Curated annotation (Swiss-Prot):
Biased composition (Gly residues): 1-12
Family annotation (SUPFAM superfamilies): P-loop containing nucleoside triphosphate hydrolases (SSF52540)
GO terms, molecular function: rRNA binding; U3 snoRNA binding
Protein's UniProt name: U3 small nucleolar RNA-associated protein 25
Pfam family, one: UTP25_NTPase-like
Subunit structure: Component of the ribosomal small subunit (SSU) processome composed of at least 40 protein subunits and snoRNA U3.
Region: Disordered, residue numbers: 1-175
GO biological process per UniProt: maturation of SSU-rRNA from tricistronic rRNA transcript (SSU-rRNA, 5.8S rRNA, LSU-rRNA)
Segments of skewed composition (Basic and acidic residues): 36-45, 164-175
One annotated Gene Ontology cellular component of this protein: small-subunit processome
InterPro entries, per database record: P-loop_NTPase (IPR027417), UTP25 (IPR010678), UTP25_C (IPR053939), UTP25_NTPase-like (IPR053940)
């Protein structure tokens, strides 16, 4: 396995899919002083006076982020006992006194103190002012406004046909026990089906005789929604489109879903449906608690009535999102579906999340604009609280119903393992997780996503005012992870997403993977060229990087070095940054390629560096250009002068293959730098690249290319 990246540095870039770094826009600096430069380029004109021509980027040390203020308890609790309920009660008997919240305490003390303040206090105040996501303190009687009102919205009473009741509120104990036992033993059964032209792989606990594949739904009328949401859904969403018809029965049935066909075109439809489901879950949970409060109040203190309707903490839904703009879209959909009378802190929210400046023209691809338009900041977190008539933004996490965050933002809120100030109790009762644009999160630091999932649904260290007589039994049994629904929306599947589904999705309702039948990108390049796919042998995933490098240096490099003068215009595309460093070092130090001039553009290259490399590549001073996938993801450079492309590895995103293999070579033909039909593409792949390969060559071809005895495949 690739390394997990640096332990304490949140923006670290490790191996492929394990320690991806931050957004890659700009150049970071080392906390140990200036970065030492690596000679990662070679110019054709050796007496060139520009020293910058021989410079190349080196991976900078990670930027250390500032401390984030939270309500974390600093005590280092012991590990959980094998008997979760008893261990939980024992941990709370040690210290049941509520902890004083930091900002409230400081505010009260300040009233009786002189006006003078220390430098540290001023620094803390300045830090809080800079933190635009700082949560506001709620009054102690935070739920006082939630008075019982007589209304006709009583359709959420116990309903055996409502998935909310059958999955969360009143599940069948025997059925759940059998399925949870099967899940804990890793006993799963699989069924395959076709849903609206999407291939569905349904996995369910093997204790079942068989799990039916839900049929597509035509519209919101078939859903068990709160009456108010049913009315707004009919107006705001209407009849379902094809994407919603396939997605809705899986989503509202509380199955885990890995949806691998999220596109720019259907993204809004999927977002609306997901937000509707999240709101429905929050409203049903909240109203059930309020009505039970009323029942208990009528019965009095001596009642034996047992109403278990809660978790340990209030937050029920978590959205993991790549940028502030993606958060803005989700929040606006929730607001439109909710139609609140009041929105508390809405102006502050818009100041922090709305960026009306148009940054990109139509020359940028649609998927690029969809991701990076608006505020593309990947450091944020937001709590949202609902009352009957109000939405409150920036509520404290422990008083929130829905949490929105980037992986980095939530990781910072949880805290650092090094200083033992971790606070993740607010994740203990999350019942629905939505990971939107997961393919974009893969280009950030995926380790943060893994860290968050590792800390979901753990039993809390502190009581946080919890009434344990109201906590559902399956929380006390430490089964919360078996009830949580996880929804992952991605443009495509990757090994990281499949592993996330395997390791962290233990839903007793089962899980479903949806993905399309891929026609392939080979015939969609818009230019005639020779495409050669060469398969190399690799004995395991761990040894794949070494086998790939060995094949590249023994089978690809010799022909490149032999015809060094004819190598002008060779672009080498490298998906992994670790592989990029290895290849760059080889070109810089190996005698086998000492006659080959080269340049490099990675995600760490700043604008001047990248501009020099592009210019030298265009005029031939760099005959070879090394180019990473993340650099292309964040910049989408329009490289000119490309005459042949070597894919050291295939990109995850099939759009990148079209843009690089088709777009760059087509541009060279238009610029009359390349004779029509003379461009070439060479791809290096192994059997472990099957997911990437399928999207490029098509679902029908991929099996033969992986399994046939021959190892070379040509397409013209």
């Amino acid at each position: 396995m690739a390394p997990r990246g640096r332990g304490g540095n949140f923006r670290g870039r490790g191996g492929r899919g394990r320690g991806r770094g931050g957004r890659g826009r700009g150049r970071a600096t080392s906390r140990f002083g200036p970065n030492r430069r690596f000679d990662g380029a070679r110019l054709a004109d050796n007496d060139e006076s520009e020293s910058s021509g021989s410079e190349a980027e080196s991976a900078p040390e990670d930027e250390v982020m500032g401390d984030v203020d939270s309500d974390a308890d600093d005590d280092d609790e012991d590990e959980q006992s094998s008997k979760p309920y008893m261990a939980l009660l024992q941990s709370f008997t040690e210290n049941n006194a509520p902890k004083a919240k930091r900002r409230k305490l400081e505010h009260q003390e300040a009233q009786g103190q002189p006006e003078e303040s220390s430098d540290d206090e001023k620094a803390d105040e300045e830090e809080e002012e800079k933190d635009i996501d700082r949560a506001e303190e709620d009054p102690e009687d935070q739920d006082a406004e939630e008075q019982i009102e007589d209304d006709d919205d009583s359709e959420d009473e116990d309903n055996l046909t409502d998935p909310f009741d059958t999955h969360f509120a009143h599940p069948d104990d025997d059925t759940v026990a059998k399925r949870v036992k099967a899940v804990q033993k890793g006993e799963w059964a699989t069924k395959r089906a076709l849903i609206q032209n999407l291939r569905a792989t349904v996995t369910y606990p093997s204790s079942d005789a068989g799990s039916e594949v839900p049929k597509p739904m035509a519209g919101p009328d078939g859903l068990s929604l709160k009456q108010k949401l049913k009315e707004t859904a009919a107006r705001k969403i209407g009849e379902f489109d094809a994407a919603q018809r396939a997605f809705s029965p899986l989503l509202f049935n509380y199955s885990d879903v890995l949806h691998c066909d999220r596109t720019v075109r259907n993204s809004d439809s999927l977002r609306k449906l997901t937000c509707l489901h999240a709101l429905n879950h929050v409203f049903k949970t909240r109203d059930r608690v309020i009505k039970n409060n009323y029942k208990l109040a009528k019965e009095g203190q001596d009642t034996e009535l047992e109403l278990r309707d809660q978790g340990f903490t209030r937050p029920k839904v978590l959205f993991l999102l790549p940028t502030r703009n993606s958060c803005l879209r989700i929040v606006n959909i929730i607001r439109d579906l909710c139609e609140p009378d009041q929105q508390e802190n809405r102006k502050r929210f818009e100041e922090g999340y709305v960026d009306k400046e148009a940054k990109f023209g139509d020359d940028r691809p649609a998927d690029f604009r969809d991701l990076f338009e608006g505020s593309d900041d990947d450091m944020f977190r937001l709590g949202m609280k609902f009352t009957r008539k109000t939405i409150k933004y920036f509520s404290q996490f422990y008083n929130s119903d829905i949490l929105f965050a980037s992986p980095l933002g939530l990781r910072m809120a949880i805290g650092s393992e090094e200083d033992k100030k971790l606070d993740f109790d607010f994740l203990s009762s999350i019942e629905m997780v939505v990971v939107d644009q997961a393919d974009a999160l893969l280009m950030q630091n995926w380790e943060h996503v893994e860290f968050i999932f590792e800390h979901l649904n753990l039993q809390p260290k502190d009581a946080h005012g919890c009434d344990f007589s109201r906590v559902r039994n399956w929380y006390l049994e430490d089964w919360a992870k078996h009830f949580r629904q996880t929804v992952i929306l991605s443009a495509f599947n990757t090994p990281e997403l499949s592993e996330l589904l395997r390791l962290h999705c233990h839903n007793w309702a089962g899980k479903v993977r949806l993905q399309p039948e891929y026609p392939g990108s080979l015939s969609q390049l818009g230019v005639k060229l020779k495409q050669t796919f060469s398969r190399f042998r690799s004995s395991s995933v761990d040894k794949d990087p070494d086998a790939r490098f060995e094949y590249f240096t023994s089978a690809i490099v010799p022909s490149l070095a032999k015809r060094a003068k004819d190598a002008t215009g060779t672009l080498i595309f490298i998906p992994s940054y670790l592989d990029f460093v290895r290849v760059r070092n080889y070109f810089a130090t190996s005698s086998a390629v000492e006659n080959v001039t080269f340049g490099a553009i990675s995600e760490y290259a700043d604008v001047p560096e990248a501009s020099r490399a592009r210019s030298h590549f265009l005029n031939g001073r760099h005959r070879v250009l090394l180019y990473t996938e993340r650099a292309h993801h964040f910049r989408r450079y329009q490289l000119r002068g490309v005459q042949r492309v070597i894919f050291y590895g295939l990109p995850d995103n099939p759009i990148f293959y079209n843009e690089i293999a088709g777009g760059y070579l087509s541009k060279s033909e238009q610029d009359m730098r390349l004779e029509p039909g003379q461009g070439s593409v060479k791809v290096v792949f192994s059997k472990y690249d099957v997911m990437k390969l399928e999207r490029i060559v098509g679902s029908k071809r991929v099996g033969k290319m992986i399994q046939e005895r021959g190892d070379t495949f040509e397409f013209i």
